[in-house]
Amino acid sequence: MTLFILTETSAGYALLKAKDKKLLKRDDLSTETATPEGVSNLLKLKSFQKFDSAATALEEVASLVEGKVTPRLAGLLDEIKDEKKVSLAVADPKLGNAIGKLPGLDIQLVADSTTTDIYRAIREHLPTLIPGLLPQDMSTMSLGLSHSLARHKLKFSPDKIDTMIVQAIALLDDLDKELNNYAMRVKEWYGWHFPELAKILNDNIAYAKLVLKMGMRSNFESADLAEILPEEIEGAVKAAADRSMGTEISQEDLENIQALAEQVVGFSEYRQQLASYLTARMNAIAPNLTALVGELVGARLIAHAGSLTNLSKSPASTLQILGAEKALFRALKTKHDTPKYGLIYHASLIGQATGKNKGKMARVLAAKASLGLRVDALAEWDDDVTEEDKAALGTEARFNLERKLAAMEGKPLKPRGVAIAPNGTPAQPKKFDINEARKYNADADAMVDDEPKSAKKQKKLVEEVQDEEMADANGASDSDSSEEESSKKSKKGKSDLEKMAEKAGLSVKRYQRKLERGEIEFDAEGNPTAVSKKDLKKAKKEAKKASKGDDKKRKRSDEGEGVDNAEKKKKKKKKDE
């Protein structure tokens, strides 16, 4: 059987013919192919089909990597179609299976470990087998093709867009931390010059914009703050600037403070831009997951799993506790209850649920999210499909979950398509609101001796004597007096309880409970002491044992008295006789 060897190079396809039909079964193959002369004695070139350009080479090699037979390769194999009893050695088993499926090609394919030595020799001595191919040109073409193939793989990688989401959500979290640190630093720094501003203005971004706009607090009269602040807060800021107790700063200090304030404003604007970019990316890549859990929670789930494909392979139970691995393994180690939710806890549907319903909603939401993820990762859509059609599964599942949650919680249904905030209310588009900071209410202060003298009770020099009604005249007085006595007794009882509880070293409520259960004992002086349940049980057991012993003694004494009485009766009878 004639043996042909298919060789793919960066220059083109080469079809080699073995001079020995049993070449692959030889034991001395590695020694025979060690030199170029030995390889040329064993193999000869049957046909060589050169690539026209670097782009053609990239297309051909990319198809070979995926295990596909190109028309150029099929045309090369047509040359051996008419020969009888032919075997073809192929380096890639996947490519060998694809060649075997070609119609009209009756060839025995060899794609196993027996071809390893012969292919190693061909790659090492390829310029000697193909005439006109220089080693320098071969190395240059191989390097260029490898770079092009790497760029092609990176361009069409299914995980490349996931990387954008992972990086965006990580950057968003970092921006929040840095923005908070920078804003606090601006307040502390500018607070030396204008400390009252932080008490009046609560918003960090508005504070930074105000520092940039006003500069020194002495410029409050000429500065137009209407673009930043509402009228009432603007008036409060200007009034505070007029009578501020802050220290004076130099122009150089102000320039550095304003430079930091510019960073705060710039970071806040970029954060808004990044958040909108992340929302658009999530709606394009994982529309069903975004419809169910939101873009931020969905992005954190994808970042935690590494990619959308990895996340779609996870079952619903893994998706439910993703992000709570430490708590899970700690619970398994200590044999405690495992956590019910991880990152998915921050989804708005779970935020609406209360109590035990949170765990139920987490379980159901994870199940629906896992189905939506598989659609997002594996579905192949046509170009004319709209975004609403892609997210139809997630939107319908969210509507059903909202209806189920409303039935469990007993709340009215939210309108369909309305985003729901974690507190259960429909989420409105965010607005730039400036709220005045909380201030200390000085009017709420109260002192004991602050009352005016006129308000204090003064002793009357002459007391008026009023007529007292007789008890028989009005029966209501008896009831009033009885009520007063009962209230006095209750007050005395409360005070006594508090004293006894202090002596026992317990709170009043605990003292009352133990007193009702009989767990309080009193000594000879009447001081209470708390007794534990174990001590009470031991005392009861000892009392039972003691009572049993007394009963036995009584029985014995009764038996002895009965014997004595019988003897006395016998003696009396004898005397009478």
Curated annotation (Swiss-Prot):
Record's compositionally biased regions (Basic residues): 568-577
Location within or outside the cell: Nucleus, Nucleolus
Entry keyword set: Nucleus, Ribonucleoprotein, Ribosome biogenesis, rRNA processing
GO molecular function, one term: snoRNA binding
Domain (Nop) ranges: 285-410
Region (Disordered): 445-577
Entry-linked InterPro entries: Nop56/Nop58 (IPR045056), NOP58/56_N (IPR012974), Nop_C (IPR042239), Nop_dom (IPR002687), Nop_dom_sf (IPR036070), NOSIC (IPR012976)
This protein's GO CC annotations: box C/D methylation guide snoRNP complex; nucleolus; small-subunit processome
Chain intervals with Basic and acidic residues compositional bias: 485-502, 544-559
Superkingdom field: Eukaryota
Gene Ontology biological-process annotations: box C/D sno(s)RNA 3'-end processing; endonucleolytic cleavage in 5'-ETS of tricistronic rRNA transcript (SSU-rRNA, 5.8S rRNA, LSU-rRNA); endonucleolytic cleavage in ITS1 to separate SSU-rRNA from 5.8S rRNA and LSU-rRNA from tricistronic rRNA transcript (SSU-rRNA, 5.8S rRNA, LSU-rRNA); endonucleolytic cleavage to generate mature 5'-end of SSU-rRNA from (SSU-rRNA, 5.8S rRNA, LSU-rRNA); protein localization to nucleolus; snoRNA guided rRNA 2'-O-methylation
Pfam families tied to this protein: Nop, NOP5NT
Functional description taken from the UniProt entry: Required for pre-18S rRNA processing. May bind microtubules.
Name of the protein: Nucleolar protein 58
Gene name as annotated: nop58
